[in-house]
């Protein structure tokens, strides 16, 4: 064995690798000897939360993953959904939380790079990106630095690669002070008959290394992503990867060309745990062994050890099982794109993962137990104490509700995110129909295609903390609702479950209940989960983040010319409310941000009502009755009306029902509701349709003038609303 493999395996070393004592004892039983240092690193990488899902796998299996349009669900690099005409959309969301807190630019950039590879590994050309970001309190000394670095990193990578960013979300809360969240989403288009998988097949076939050289960046990244932070966080900087979007663009083109050639048997990107994970996953899925020779791996640094090469997370790399008769043509493609193409091993029939380095065998492990048979835990969990319903009469009505509306529009929570998305290229590729800032981003399938895809990403973490089950339901419902506002049929979703330490029963309870809520909503709304990611141990010095189960979804428009957006209001339109008057103030931004009331149950999500209202909204959009649509969520009716006025630059004169106190009707966050701006002459017909479908529809106003005028309560000009809405973020960033 080489010197690095002669390192003594001590209890301290085992603990540094994130392995529990019982896990190490299981390793000893499994292999019948003490592991080498490199083998210890491999077990650490493959058995951590980031790669094995050992705390969440039991519960993830309960999610609905099948549907009429689902081609590939969880278990591959990305989910695959049929969109007709021989095409499919391939998509996934994944976290890069820990690296982005340590090194925000590179952490966020390589998060984008990793999810891009997940998508084009399947044979899809990326067409759209989103990101869901959570930062600490705006007055925390690191927050502005982290926002600037993360946004710059996302823009720097996605813009250079050439994929448009079409949506996303940002939250600020002190519970993210020590652990920010960076969740990146990418979707691509592929042919249904040209999807590529990671399952290796055939014995004695060449295993080929593709892409950039291997360095020491990211060594131990997967293990770091499965641990809490403490005061030694700055020492983890070397575990953050460094990305090169131009190399990734070349890798995309080379891979798609290789796939067109028909040379690919199986392919896997090198993400978390690098060469180790990609090789083990391909072999384990195909019931094959893998033998690698590290002397063949292209490296960019001298004297790299086997441990470093196996656990490096250098970016822009792939591993492929190749049809041997096409080696020459495949090699020529990669060299044409200036990328490395090196045969570093072969598939075997012995179900062993063997690694050679400088003539010696440094790894010899059972591949199935490393891969899809890693330990799975049924961790104890507890339910949170139920929050009482916050009654309307318990919530003070502030005297000047116009000032309240302006305050909320000019806040960290509710202000425009223009400062962020204007740093992203939202129009590259030329197919963007709806840019960020709307309910959902929309992209044409291709330049000469009538079809388009709608994308949204949603979660309300404060709801999830108060009631993880309802919060999980609401994340799905709001995503589904946002897609429906365009007229698109919601097809499927991907999840990104961000939580604290699952070894704490109260945190594990948040995860379990959120998954149950997500599953229930997805079943009722026919919105299957086809891919996803779990990020646990988001804690610093024992302080956990807010539970944040992000849901990103995709919908299909058969004819994008019938699409509507938030900004399409026309003078004289009737404004109608789908759903009842608002009344629920528990966990509302009115209660929290204006009155500092953090108690109370979140709004209940009636999934059957969500389904009925969404179907009705899509139907009337398809009939051509609607000029603009917007869902009602954070901030209730008041914020929704203000946003429509701001986006359309047209006024609305509205009147409340006066059945409830004004602050409840304006700022209640009851779910399953929409605002529609409709052609005035169809109002009576819409009322009849609503009655037939048992849908609550109320005319609450008209599009007129240049102010938001809510009778007897407030009058605010479009300019004043816009100034409040657009000014907070630039001021916060010092501009």
From Swiss-Prot:
Positions contributing to Mg(2+) 2 binding: 118, 269
Active-site feature positions: 50, 96
SUPFAM superfamilies on file: PurM C-terminal domain-like (SSF56042), PurM N-terminal domain-like (SSF55326)
Coiled coil location: none
GO biological process, one term: 'de novo' IMP biosynthetic process
Cellular component, GO annotation: cytoplasm
The keyword Cytoplasm belongs to this UniProt entry's keyword annotation: yes
Superkingdom as given in the UniProt entry: Bacteria
Keyword entries, A-Z: ATP-binding, Cytoplasm, Ligase, Magnesium, Metal-binding, Nucleotide-binding, Purine biosynthesis
Compartments in which it is found: Cytoplasm
E.C. no: 6.3.5.3
InterPro entries, sorted: PRibForGlyAmidine_synth_PurL, PurL_linker, PurM-like_C_dom, PurM-like_C_sf, PurM-like_N, PurM-like_N_sf
Binding site for ATP: 53, 92, 495, 532
Amino-acid positions noted as binding Mg(2+) 1 in the UniProt annotation, renumbered to this chain: 94, 533
NCBIfam families per UniProt: FGAM_synth_II, PRK01213.1
Assembly and oligomerization: Monomer. Part of the FGAM synthase complex composed of 1 PurL, 1 PurQ and 2 PurS subunits.
Protein name stated in the entry: Phosphoribosylformylglycinamidine synthase subunit PurL
Organism: Bartonella henselae (strain ATCC 49882 / DSM 28221 / CCUG 30454 / Houston 1) (Rochalimaea henselae)
Taxon lineage: Bacteria, Pseudomonadati, Pseudomonadota, Alphaproteobacteria, Hyphomicrobiales
